[in-house]
């Protein structure tokens, strides 16, 4: 993935020129979609362009757009989030927070455009890599790159389907303007398409070497395949049992991962691509070859007291959920995920050990009721004061697989099989004792609790609420 990061920005311009393929005259010294795909290097460059839309690059390719599109669309509608003071200055963000938005909302439009751009790039990878002469690419590499294209195409379609009622399935690279006009697909057809793409991607390598870490693997494909089946199980009651079984089967194939003991390190830049990470957006402070894979995300997440812009805050609902089980962790405090996720007024953050960037909470915050996100903030004072950060963003973690598998098992009527999976996450990440209760309803409630406090800012709550019909 390191190589892909550096070449992505170079090749995107070449692939954008494909928009002019409708013209009958081509410049002999300009790459187009018809002349670009010559060998393995070109195919890898095209794949890099497909990955690039994970960063939701718009605003002329500036990485400012990454937090300003992804989190307003995916997080502002969650009940565990509230808008910060500066966010209230942007009407299109406020619309998302108070549910008065329409499809004309600019953040929705950017989100839609960026992911369909990624789908177009992925379609080029799938179609054009297959046309590269055999002498310029070996068969195994060709197959792997095409299957990677299938994964990326499925991911973008799935994110769109999770956020809209209906989407347009784009199953081919468009070369004729007449093909742009296409009706919305049914959710059933969209799920069928996504699932088939993910099935193809399960043949990807199980692991990646250092130069390619962050690229999709078979584990990535199986994890999202299970997620797709689980979500679909709630939408199609007549096939619920079958989809739940398929979800569990997919989750069982997610192998070679473990939960990380130090929860906060996965979101501070200290433990990139950890043993728990299944699919993760890569960032780098390097600007070599014009790369811009760094962000000011820590400014966007951070509160004003910590030099941030005050765009996003935890809601009282989230704070109450963290405190729900009381100070019952083995540490004698609340669930350890609370301290890894939030800065708040408590003995832990005011014990004189400088746990908030070398100082106590009280040294930073005049308002003692103020609660701020720690998650996705740099771990050091030096990092806090840098203009840019390069903290990776996990999109799929093993904890998610365990909790989704527990959910599927419980919905099948096997709460006794779900409970050990829940307790594993509670113990490793929260230092919490085993859950109370053994009934299906108790397990349902516990899964919701665990997901609420496990994934803040990872943007699963809205999809959970939709899946559960809440």
Where in this protein do the model-derived segments appear?
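Sec-dependent signal peptide recognition
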Residues: 2-9
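An aromatic- and glycine-enriched ligand-binding surface/loop that stacks and positions planar moieties
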Residues: 20-89, 167, 191, 198-200, ...
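C-terminal substrate/ligand-recognition segments
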Residues: 109, 336-423
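C-terminal structured "cap/appendage" subdomains that terminate the fold
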Residues: 421-470
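C-terminal motif of bacterial Sec signal peptides marking the signal peptidase cleavage site
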Residues: 16-18
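Alpha-helix C-terminal capping/termination sites
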Residues: 159, 163, 231, 235-240, ...
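Conserved, well-structured interaction surfaces
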Residues: 39, 44-48, 52-60, 84-164, ...
